[in-house]
Amino acid sequence: MSFKVEFKNYLDELHKSLCDVSDWMYENPELSFEEFETSKYLVEYLKKYNSDVVYPTHNLDTAFEITFGKDGPLVVLCVEYDALPEIGHACGHNIIATCSIGAGLGLRNLVDKLGIRVKLLGTPAEEGGGGKIILLENGAFELSLIHI
């Protein structure tokens, strides 16, 4: 079976639960640096797939990371989850976060075959809060070949 087919088949299995994650986030928006319930929810979801979630991390109370694979170039997928004041997830972070999680989980079973590592990086305060800058300054992107 090709990598593409294997990836797609696994995402098909995850489809319902990923939609549930997106819906939950949409219904429970939290502002920059206040994403306590959202980060806890996402961490609990990810623990089903790997118990090695680091939370909190990088000097941010609502940041997390989980890495799949042991060797090879590191791909970092940012999971953004803050909302905007008064309009919630009009920016679509519920969808962006879910897509990043889906991509990371889809690659989880392929990391050894592809010779890579994949890190899902919980990225709070993206909407004007400078969360990515804080993550960068605290080493979250060190050794990454690609960060998306």
Model-derived regions: residue spans:
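Short helix-loop-beta-strand segments that form the rim/entrance of peptidase-like active sites
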Residues: 108-128
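Conserved small/polar residues in nucleotide/adenosyl-binding loops
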Residues: 146-148
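Acidic/His- and Gly-rich active-site-bordering loop/insert found
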Residues: 3-115
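Glycine-rich phosphate-binding loop signature in dinucleotide/nucleotide-binding domains
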Residues: 142-144
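Acidic, glycine-rich active-site loops and adjacent beta-strand->loop/helix elements
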Residues: 81-85, 121-129, 134, 139-140
